[in-house]
Structures are given as structure tokens and as C-alpha cells.
Amino acid sequence: IHPSDLDPDLCRQIRASILLAGPMLARSGELILPPPGGDVIGRRRVDTHILALNKLGALFSYNDCFHFSAPQLKGAEILLDEASVTATENTIMAAVKAEGRTIIRNAASEPHIQQLCQFLNLLGADIKNIGSNTLIIDGVKELHGGEFTIGPDYLEVISFVGAAVVTRGEIR
């Protein structure tokens, strides 16, 4: 992935394209991202992402695309203004390669956040307090490869349970 050559049409198809900001800043120090698209459930804020990455030393501008740059990310104390899952993920992925310690307060703590932290630790990251709303991340210079099994999607599981209850059906 080249940080300034992302396909605008693909980025506009998914809201999650904003999740490229943290890892690309950690990897290359730059990202030019066409505006994310995807679902039309409602307005999706990205300012929590921008403010958190800014605390780590990233600069941000907007002119038809989001432009993030950070020659060197540095650890910081960050209070997320909302416990956003994607902003927490973005901040974690940037902070693992930032120089020094990062403390993320009001972090989302959903199971997939915990699994992301466990996976990154397997790759050589140093993330503590996994599962809490305050994460402590000591940045590392390098990550390495590894294998990780992702657990079941708890939202999908509860959807099936709810459907069975409403229809008085069974789950097999």
C-alpha cells in the first residue's frame, strides 16, 4: 500500500478506510486518504481519530482528501472525547510504533479491541491493561510476524440469539 495512492472509489465504499491512518502513519509517516464512505446509518465523526493522532504528533489537513503526516510519532497521554471503537483501534495501531509511552483514556474495550491488542502483543507490541478503558502502550521499534485466531463476532452471536428468542426458534 502506498500512502498517497489509495483508490478513491474503494475508500468511498467503506467507512473503515479511516483505519488506515494509524498504521500507515506508524509505517510510513504519511497518508493521503480519500473521504471514507460506506453505510448511511448516520453521520460518523472522525475528529476523535484526528485529535488522538495529533496528540501523537501527526499533522492533519483536508483538501478533498485527508492528509496525515508524522515524521516521528511520540507517545502521549490521550483522553478520547468518546469511547469510539475505530478511534481506539487507530490510536493503538499508531501508538505501538510511537517513541515512548502512550496512555489512552476512555478507550473502547469491546472484545475485538482486546483481540487487536492481543494480536499486536503477539507481534512484539507492549500493550497493558487490555480490556480496561485505560490502555498503556510502550512503543517498540519493530513488529514481527505471527499467527492469531480471531474469536467469534459477539454482535453476530447475539443477533442469532435475538432472532431465536423473537421467533421462538432454535439455534443449532
Language-model segments: which ranges?
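Structural preference for solvent-exposed beta-strand-turn elements
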Residues: I1-R172
